[in-house]
Structure formats: structure tokens, C-alpha cells
Amino acid sequence: MSMALGPGADSPKTEEARASPTPGPGTPTGTPTRTPSRTAPGALTAKPPLAPKPGTTVASGVTARVAAVTAGQVTSGHGAAAATSASTTQALEDPSGPGPGPSGTCEALVAVVTVTPAPEPAENSQDLGSTSSLGPGISGPRGQAPDTLSYLDSVSLMSGTLESLADDVSSMGSDSEINGLALRKTDKYGFLGGSQYSGSLESSIPVDVARQRELKWLEMFSNWDKWLSRRFQKVKLRCRKGIPSSLRAKAWQYLSNSKELLEQNPGKFEELERAPGDPKWLDVIEKDLHRQFPFHEMFAARGGHGQQDLYRILKAYTIYRPDEGYCQAQAPVAAVLLMHMPAEQAFWCLVQICDKYLPGYYSAGLEAIQLDGEIFFALLRRASPLAHRHLRRQRIDPVLYMTEWFMCIFARTLPWASVLRVWDMFFCEGVKIIFRVALVLLRHTLGSVEKLRSCQGMYETMEQLRNLPPQCMQEDFLVHEVTTLPVTEALIERENTAQLKKWRETRGELQYRPSRRLHGSRAIHEERRRQQPPLGPSSSLLSLPGLKSRGSRAAGGAPSPPPPARRASAGPAPGPVVTAEGLHPSLPSPTGNSTPLGSSKETRKQEKERQKQEKEREKERQKQEKEREKQEKERQKWEKEQEKERQKQEKKAQGRKLSLRRKADGPPGPQDGGDRSSASEARQDAYF
Amino acid sequence: MAETYDFLFKFLVIGSAGTGKSCLLHQFIENKFKQDSNHTIGVEFGSRVVNVGGKTVKLQIWDTAGQERFRSVTRSYYRGAAGALLVYDITSRETYNSLAAWLTDARTLASPNIVVILCGNKKDLDPEREVTFLEASRFAQENELMFLETSALTGENVEEAFLKCARTILNKIDSGELDPERMGSGIQYGDASLRQLRQPRSAQAVAPQPCGC
């Protein structure tokens, strides 16, 4: 318990440092002074009636507290699993107490400030094994009421969110359960209201399952390189099942490899923060700060710590990539990251998303998004010919509806539980997931004759696409549909080539050539492997067009220096380095991590046993894995054949009506992908 | 579907980021100020049936993202708009300075005949004003725009702006300056007028199909 409280007690300090106008020790002078000063007239949008409310003097005083509480709740937002298992993480976090605060802080606070109506405390006390979680679990209810209240009061002082919440209820549907006091509670993700507020309807995973998953993930973390290179299928599967909320932040950083970027660039973020920045970008960023998830407690307060952090990382990015600057769609993405991790980590994660996962999405001209729109539309023809035909007849360009979906990775579209699951898969498998989700959504919105009946005109159709049927966005349903949809990386790449060709024919050369898109964590991992051995310039092989930008990034200090040693030691724990992240302190042998779950002696015994078992199991698993991979390949062959057949049939069906168009479009036949090496294609197919 | 109207107009709301486009739309549709809003990525829209000069008109309003780099995407929304609210923020000269570019976009991409009303939004923030009424109204005159200063917060002139635009379009239809039956006019007959007219709509409905480009 004391362990848990340790970092928790720290938190107000660290946060205060950040919140107060005087820059904290590490904080650059430029940023914080600028933010508050701007947010004051940033009452800019806070027009007269609003202005008295925000009374900025009040704000800065209270922010610290808000921040502290927020931090706790945000992570508590990770759900029941987070709280129950907080013990695991807390203990892990503990030794690193002094390390970069927020993440540790969050975890520690979890149990203490939970507002969620959830049954965590009960679960905790039932679980006799977890003594240490019992502590904060008990202290929770006691301390919570006053804290919560004053926090909420302070929020309502500072922003209009709560008041306007009442209005907003109407738009949340008539059967909304939210009313009166209930409004003031956050859901388990930290939302105070709005369309993404989750009622109590969420299915939660049984505690023991959650804990098992955590252990598995911890084991993966400790051998990450090995897992990625040799047992990626398993990693993928686990991402699809949903990353345990307590470990989500860390997993995202591992999957995106932002973790390594952070390690290789110590102090870089601070340096970027300190740089003056281009006013052209800063102005736009400031205008957007209060417009990100205004119903999330972290971002509800004007000038609160969530908004400040948002400012920091968005600004840092414009300095990191001056050629890219700031795109408004980056803000929601950054905000989602910030809900899970401290600013510096969120920044590097954002960098990975913008550079590796979705290169060009946020660049001037937005060509990449338009191109993906075309690719999407081509894929839709297979996934849902009806929807495809309908949209085509209505002349609804893909960019009319998919822009926000793709650019924000659905962060503004789906219910929150689904957002997180989608992001889990996205970090692992890359853009393919975005395509699949979008295809699923369209298929279930416009995919049948009855559904189309209510969308006679363009406007009705668009309206339908803005108000997707809730059942198709529901977490489990969506994930199931997404994982069974046969849209592979190879397919996307093939379509990419085809659409790029079309683009060149009709619109000329691309103005902006982004670097090559990497399909998820394995591709990122492989790229890194290729780059890091002293290969020298031959890495140009990877991406001809990307060379330039990569060069500029190199100037930014990103790549080379440390790796070789680490590469060699791919096996055991990247431990010490991780500690620096403040996420994962002592050597994380999977079993060591479970220590806090039980009384220590017992657990140690158990651990040893478990280690043995684990090793044996590991061997077995590897065998199985190999077998499974074989089967997987066979299945894929079979599926390819099926796909071909289906296409044939589709063509026949279409052929009757649209023989002309068919010729024009041409079958998406093998010759499209011909220029890609077929070997890589086969491998990519195996991903799916 | 049950609603009947004489005409349907497609409207755009355009202008730089943070000028209050979405808030104007929200104020017009819901009659209240939208306090906690996301910024628009891509497009939002809303519709409302209004009564203008004895005719019922359904306004179908497309609200666009303001940031410069979204323009390439938002262009696809322009097609076939009959009217537009061109919005700037009276407390930000920068947003005023980019008006010309927005106007060009609207006239080239939507239609040269598009009826545009210039809206100096955030009228309630008069003390922080950077663009004078006179200056803007001169700009409006030079470019043949109507002009109003609006406040999405208080609602002042918001409804007026939309109605004024609609009224002008109706007048142009009456005077024959605008032909609703021309493709891409942004105007459609509603059910009410369809009953009186000899089904001009069927021609329209068929039109898009042959060009399966």
C-alpha cells in the first residue's frame, strides 16, 4: 500500500510544476509560459458569458489537483482490469518512482481515486492473493468522494463542459441513462459525457483472464524481439484479443517501436519543446487545444494539463518535422495517446504513427488520404458490391466519409471500447486494420437492399454514414468482423499500385512523396533490423522516395548510434533501458512481475515452478506454432483460391449489367501485383 | 421523408480554421451555441426546412474543415452548391486575409453563380476586433457578396445569414437568372413543387448513371 501511495503522493508535485506558469525544472521556458498566456485570451472562443467562468486565475490554481486526479482516473479508465491488476503494475512501477512521473503516477493512483461505479474494490477484497492491491482498494472509497467532488467542481469552474453536458444529453439518444448526478461521473475511460460516453453496458473480462493476459504480455515484453521475429502470429492474436488495459500504453510503445526511438533520443523531446516553433503552426494548434475530446476529463479543463501536454507534443512535432508542420487531424490522435502515456512517450508514439504507419496522411495536400480513399473504394467493391455500387451511383467520393475515420484512426467515430481494440490491432498490424474496420462499417451500413432503401439520396446516405448503426460498432462484433475480413496487406499494396497508376494518369505526379508505409509492428521491426546492422547506405533499398525524409530525420538525431549491442542481445530483457521510461522498472522476468500478486515467499516458489512449466510450455508452443503456421499457409492458399473464384462470380454477376465498366476497371488480377516480389507477397499474405 | 418542401438548396459553410463555421451551423440548426465541439475533420452537415417568402425550402448545409491542407479534400464537397456562407473571424485578420482564396475556390469548384454571403463571425468579441465592419463590407461589395456580422454565441444574425442567402437564390430563380433544372445548380425541386411540375426530377435522377466514370 505504501508502495502504491509513494508515487501517488508525488504526483501533485510533478503536475503542479507543469501546471503552474513557472516552468518546472525540465520544462522549457518557451512552452508553458506561452500556453497559459494564450489560453487566457484563448477565452477567445470563450466569449463573454463564458469568460467569467474560466477565470483563469482560478484555473491555474486548481489545475494541479485536476491533473493529479485526472491521471488516476485516466488509467482507471483502463477498466476493471486495470484496477484489479493495478497491483501488478504498481509494484512494478514502484522502484522507478523517481523516474518520469506521470505514467507511474497514473498507475499508482488508480485504485485510490477510482470514480467508476465499477466493482473493483469488491473484486480486490475477494482476491485474497493480492494483498497489496487490497490496500489502495480499500482506501479508495474512503478518499474518493470529496476528491471527486472538488475535482468536478473545479472543472465546472474552469470550463463549460459540465453545463453544456446537460444540453448534450439530448443528442445522445433518448434512452440515455445519463441524467442528473450521474452526469458527473466519468465512465471507465474517463469520459464525462458526449457521444463516446460508455454506459455500464461494457462487458468486462473476468479478473483471472485479465491477469493471465497480463502475465503473457509481460513475458512478451521481456523477450520482445524474439516474439516479434519468431512468434509474430501469437503477438498478433493477443493484440486482437485486446491488450490488457494496464499494459496498453507500454504495448503500444513496443509495437510501434517508439520505445526505442525514445531511448535513442534522450532529451530530444525537451529540446524540441524549448525551440521557439513557427507561429503559423502554434496559432492553429492553440485554436485546437480545447477541441479535442472536450468530454474527456483529461481535456475538459481549459488550459488543464491535458491541453498543455497536447500543446507540447503537437508543437514538438512541428519542429521535429518542419516539412510536415501541423495537421488538425493529428490532435485527436495525440490526445488518445496522451490519455495513456506521458507527453514524451506520446510524442514518439505519434512520430511513429505519422512516419511509419500512416506516412503522408497529415502532410500538406493530403494526397495519401485521397489515395487511400481510392484504394478503399476499390476494396469495397469486393467486400460489399452493393454498397460500392450505391456510393458510386450517388457519386459520393470516398473522402466525403472516410477522411475522419482514417485520419483519426476512428478515435472520433467508434464507442471507446472499440476505439481501443482497434488501436490495439492497428499498432500491431498497421493500416490494414483501418481499411478493414471501414469496410466492415460500410458493409453493415449500406450492404443490403433494405439498408439502402432508407438512403435514396446522396444526403440521406451521407447522414447514414455519419450515424452508423451502433451494433456494428460494438466492440466484440466489430473485432470479430475485422479479423475475419480477407483483406490482406498484399491486397492493399496491390491496389495501392493500381490506384497510384490511375492517379498518375489522371492527376499527374504526386506532389508529396511520403516514405514507404510499414504494415504494422513486424514490418517496423524488420526495417529496423535491416537498418541497424552496419549496412550503410544500402538501406535505400527500403524506400526510394522516402530517402529524403529519412535523411532529414537522421539530422533530427533519430537513427543509428546505440543499437548493435542491443540487437545482439535480442533475447533477455531490454530491462534497464525500459526503466528509463518509468513504465517498467526492475528486470521484468514474467514471473517476477507477478510477485505482488501474492505474499512474497509463496509466490517465489510458485514462480520457480511456473518458470519451469513456462519453459516446457514454450517448447511445446513453438512446435505448435510451427504447425499452425503450416496450416495457416495452407489455409491461405485455399482462401486465395476462394477469393479468385468469388471474383469470377462477382465479375459474372456484374458482367451482365456492366460489361463496359468491367473492362475499364480491369480485373484486379495478378499482374497488378506483379511488380512486387512475389516472395514478399506470399509472406505478407501470411500475415493476414 | 414526410417533410414536404418546394425547394432544396445545397449550402456550404467555408472559411479558415477556428472561425466558428461549425458553431454557426449548430446555432442555425439547434438554436443554441455549441460549447464543446470538436474541430471538423472532413465534413459535417445538417439540414433545416425554412420558410422564405411563402415557399418552404430545405437547406442542406455542408460544413467543411477549415485548415488549409484539408482544402484538397473538402473540394469534393463543393460540387453542386447553390449557396455559401463565407466565414471569417472579426478578431483575426489572418482569417480575413484568406477570404479571397476561399471565394475563388467556391466560384470555380461549386459554380460561378453560387450565391455567397460573407459572415464576420464572433461579433460578440467586439473589443478584440481586428477587422472593421467598413473594411469587410467594402470587400463584400467589390466581390458582389452579401455581408453580415454574426455571432454564433449569441445567435445574432445567424438565422438571418442563412435566410438572406436562401432568399437571394429564390429571387434569382424567379427572375430566371438561376435554372433549377440545370445540373449542378445545387437546387432541386421538393415534393411539394413536384406535384405541380411535370416531373423534372426523373431526368435528374437518371442523369448520373450513364457516366460511370
Swiss-Prot record, chain B:
Any single GO CC term annotated in Swiss-Prot or TrEMBL for this entry: recycling endosome
Positions contributing to GDP binding: 18-23, 121-122, 124, 152-153
Effect in UniProt of substituting residue 67 to L: GTP-locked. Interacts with RUFY1
Annotated positions binding GTP: 18-23, 37, 39-40, 66, 121-122, 124, 152-153
UniProt xrefs under InterPro entries: P-loop_NTPase (IPR027417), Rab4 (IPR041819), Rab_GTPases_membrane_traffic (IPR050209), Small_GTP-bd (IPR005225), Small_GTPase (IPR001806)
Residue positions where 5-glutamyl serotonin is found in the record: 67
Positions of S-geranylgeranyl cysteine lipidation: 211, 213
Reactions catalysed, as given in the entry: GTP + H2O = GDP + phosphate + H(+)
Alphabetic keyword roster: Acetylation, Cell membrane, Endosome, GTP-binding, Hydrolase, Lipoprotein, Magnesium, Membrane, Metal-binding, Methylation, Nucleotide-binding, Phosphoprotein, Prenylation, Protein transport, Transport
Cofactor(s) required for function per UniProt: Mg(2+)
Residue interval(s) of motif Switch 1: 39-44
Record EC number: 3.6.5.2
Protein family according to the UniProt entry: Belongs to the small GTPase superfamily. Rab family.
NCBIfam families membership: small_GTP
Domain remark in the UniProt entry: Switch 1, switch 2 and the interswitch regions are characteristic of Rab GTPases and mediate the interactions with Rab downstream effectors. The switch regions undergo conformational changes upon nucleotide binding which drives interaction with specific sets of effector proteins, with most effectors only binding to GTP-bound Rab.
Name this protein carries in UniProt: Ras-related protein Rab-4B
Organism: Homo sapiens (Human)
